Amino acid sequence: MGVIRILLSLVSLVFKALDSVGILWDARLRLSEFIYGKHGVLTVRGPTKRILKLPACVIAEYIKKRKLTCVEVIEAFRDRILEVNPILNAVVGDRFDDASEEAQHIDQVLDSSDINLNQEKSDLLSKPLLGVPITVKESIACEGFTNSAGLVDRKDKIASEDAAVVKNLRDAGAIPIAVTNCSELCMWWETTNNVYGRTNNPYETSKIAGGSSGGEGAIISAAGSVCGIGSDVGK
């Protein structure tokens, strides 16, 4: 049994090493190609920036300890979304400029030696998700974004305030950077509608991303978001 445990530990270390350089991502794509054929296979390679592979709690901790700047984090996920979204059609609205401004303010306060900012700095350091970029399902109100739920009659509807879940995450320090596609009125198993079109599966683009939170699932799976807000109407 001791030998088996050692072998399993070695295998685990090998897989972690391969995953850290994106090799497992490519392997999954090659397996998909073998099973389904070359048509529709995702052409975007796995993420190469280390930031994109970090969990939310680690990102927040690194920002607080100044191992990462908040601007670096926001820019990394912005660039990843711009890279993969033309293939996935997962993100249907963004606030990259506003998010960058919020990130710059966080960095300025944390790096400042001004004693007048000590209270604000203390408040920021108490936030568990400080600087973590998040995405939000478009059917969930996020101030300034469309809130159509994929319905043509609501395509010009703009959220005037955040839903409670979005507000709570903002209060915890998270920074919304984009909203994502959903099925029409969140009632279908495929993320497609007549406002934004269909969202594709990151691992096999000829397949669906599921629903109704397929936009969230797709962009998070493609390392374009640390975490996000989805929903399920249940059975």
Q: Would you name each region that the model predicts?
A:
Residues 1-104, 108:
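An N-terminal boundary/leader segment
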Residues 13, 17, 22, 28-32, ...:
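A structural signal for the main folded, soluble domain(s) of proteins
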Residues 71-75, 133, 166:
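Hydrophobic face of alpha-helices
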Residues 77, 99, 131, 137, ...:
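Conserved hydrophobic/aromatic pocket- or pore-lining residues that grip, position, or stack substrates
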Residues 84, 122, 127-165:
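Enzymes and membrane/adaptor proteins characterized by extended Gly/Ser/Thr/Asp/Glu-rich
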Residues 106-132:
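Immediate post-signal peptide segment of exported/extracytoplasmic ligand-binding proteins
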Residues 161-235:
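Short glycine/serine-rich loop segments
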